[in-house]
Amino acid sequence: MPNLVVDFDKVLTLAGTDLGYSEYREITQEQVNLFADATSDHQWIHVDPERAKDGPFGAPIAHGFLTLSLLIPLWSELFDVEGASAKVNYGLDRVRFTSPVKVGSRVRLQATIAEVSEVKGGVQIKVANTIEIEGQERPAVVAEFLARFYS
């Protein structure tokens, strides 16, 4: 169950709402390998643990876009809207990959609803997201995510 569940007619009142934190999720080598297969990005810093030990990060790292894609499952732990006929991932305004995520690390999402606006047939929210790496000061990803909810 998400941290916050609201009725569709309340979404316009949510600007500035801190959604808190998701649970931590471990990044596994299997997950990285599957992402590499799905995207045809088999760079050795991701998929060759032996070679990556001697690389710039001392271990294999997750693809930046793999870490970014975790926004969706982590986001589902934080927020939901009841009474919407459709829920759409509308896009991203700003994304920065600020720190590599080593395989075996655990990440979580912190999110705040930054803006809310009406759109034809519904409501759009802009969410300020930070994907944190457990035990590290610098986050993995900072992104502004746009979602739309239609009546």
Give the residues covered by each predicted segment:
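A solvent-exposed, acidic/Ser-Thr-rich amphipathic alpha-helical stretch
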Residues: 65-67
